[in-house]
């Protein structure tokens, strides 16, 4: 009985040896993403006017089960509007470490301003860089966040480190950390 089971196992191994490998040599090769893939959040603009679609209603923040979104609304100036309507998102922040990419914010948005895109490379060196602000997410800003940062830091040495205290955020002190 033991010899038969060993022969079956060896046969299975030999059969798998000649099959095409499933792995992808990332980053040289890119895997094709599924149409329903949920990646980095994007805030969109109206195509004709260029105004932001976000009206600062905070429905995305209310729908977020991970409490990753913070929205602070501001009154729109009628002479220089930021978005159509009376209000706009003065502050829009999303903590990508808390986000679970469920898409509830996208579904809750009444104007279609929040869209989960296809970008999935969001690693960074510092905690504060993982909290995306409105300027990091608006479509129409040249290049991605990482490309703009790399262009600004071209030729500068990069210092990589870690926090000894674990990097826990203190609610009373806010999100600013010493470098």
From Swiss-Prot:
Keywords: 4Fe-4S, Cell membrane, Iron, Iron-sulfur, Membrane, Metal-binding, NAD, Quinone, Repeat, Translocase, Ubiquinone. It is found in: Cell membrane. Its EC number is 7.1.1.-. One of its GO terms (molecular function) is iron ion binding. It is a peripheral membrane protein. It catalyses: a quinone + NADH + 5 H(+)(in) = a quinol + NAD(+) + 4 H(+)(out). Its cofactor is [4Fe-4S] cluster. Pfam families: Fer4_7. Its main location: membrane. [4Fe-4S] cluster 1 binds at residues 54, 57, 60, 109. InterPro entries: 4Fe4S_Fe-S-bd, 4Fe4S_Fe_S_CS, NADH_quinone_OxRdtase_chainI. [4Fe-4S] cluster 2 binds at residues 64, 99, 102, 105. It is an enzyme of class 7 (translocase). GO terms for cellular component: plasma membrane. Belongs to the complex I 23 kDa subunit family. NDH-1 shuttles electrons from NADH, via FMN and iron-sulfur (Fe-S) centers, to quinones in the respiratory chain. The immediate electron acceptor for the enzyme in this species is believed to be ubiquinone. Couples the redox reaction to proton translocation (for every two electrons transferred, four hydrogen ions are translocated across the cytoplasmic membrane), and thus conserves the redox energy in a proton gradient. PANTHER family: NADH DEHYDROGENASE [UBIQUINONE] IRON-SULFUR PROTEIN 8, MITOCHONDRIAL, NADH DEHYDROGENASE UBIQUINONE IRON-SULFUR PROTEIN 8, MITOCHONDRIAL. This is NADH-quinone oxidoreductase subunit I. It comes from Deinococcus deserti (strain DSM 17065 / CIP 109153 / LMG 22923 / VCD115). The gene is nuoI.
